UniProtKB/Swiss-Prot annotation:
Domain RRM stretches: 35-118, 126-205
Region (Disordered) residue spans: 1-34, 204-225, 335-379
Name the UniProt record assigns to this protein: Heterogeneous nuclear ribonucleoprotein A3
A GO cellular component entry from the record: postsynaptic density
Amino acid sequence: MEVKPPPGRPQPDSGRRRRRRGEEGHDPKEPEQLRKLFIGGLSFETTDDSLREHFEKWGTLTDCVVMRDPQTKRSRGFGFVTYSCVEEVDAAMCARPHKVDGRVVEPKRAVSREDSVKPGAHLTVKKIFVGGIKEDTEEYNLRDYFEKYGKIETIEVMEDRQSGKKRGFAFVTFDDHDTVDKIVVQKYHTINGHNCEVKKALSKQEMQSAGSQRGRGGGSGNFMGRGGNFGGGGGNFGRGGNFGGRGGYGGGGGGSRGSYGGGDGGYNGFGGDGGNYGGGPGYSSRGGYGGGGPGYGNQGGGYGGGGGGYDGYNEGGNFGGGNYGGGGNYNDFGNYSGQQQSNYGPMKGGSFGGRSSGSPYGGGYGSGGGSGGYGSRRF
């Protein structure tokens, strides 16, 4: 005889979830990268178990790891947790602030390898740039689309000052940086029937900061390592300026150090007459994404600051330079096969960092070292 639950009590859905998520315990339609959080500012006393004990309150964890120095086994001050579905990640982020072992920590959505090479990828911002919108797209179209991600503060559809014609891009500001992080993980969005590209909107000062950090990264020419601009080619973006051009993101008017918008090229000339988003060293500046810079968290330099590193966590150690992965390797499935068993990265072979310093991630995900940027010589 089947025993039915009391009225009003939700029935368990574990069987349905298991079927939906498959044998590995997660939804096969949701990539691991979207289910993963970087946890910064950890106490050096925090262990895998205590980190798991805290974050499993918001869902099922398929992986949880505190990164440690492979020699000393001391915590590096950060870790990763991976949930079984994106809904659980959202729940954990909605529950901020988080305190683990008596210390307030900083969770952020993990940045993929491909996105990590972009200037400002690790900056905390509340504004996005929406490019490639068409003449028939109005403010309400943008609001209808983006309000499902979070609370919108302002929307600016940019127009030409003289003609009043739309310039093919807009800015949307939210009340929470996590909303931006969640949106930019999905690079392309269909708005009012048109494919649009969405990026973090960086001010002129933030662009210059990102450019100066890249300049310290070494390597020859931009993020790819062996020359070649980030953009390349010369296709038009939006209605006018070159998106890639020969100066990378700077476009025709930007030259090899083209700016984010700066005048003639860039995002459709976006920034124009001395606006905040014009000028600066640009997306195609030289060098890797490394060097000093502003802090990502609360224990030192930036993502490549000071002694390098993911916030300079663990007193100057960096995300690769102090042996993030030590001698261990990542395989094509993002499984870490070194001294700490986990599966938190979308890596493709090679040592995660070696023992190099001078740039974050120790010369790149796929490199064994070197002083290049995030993927300097093997991208």
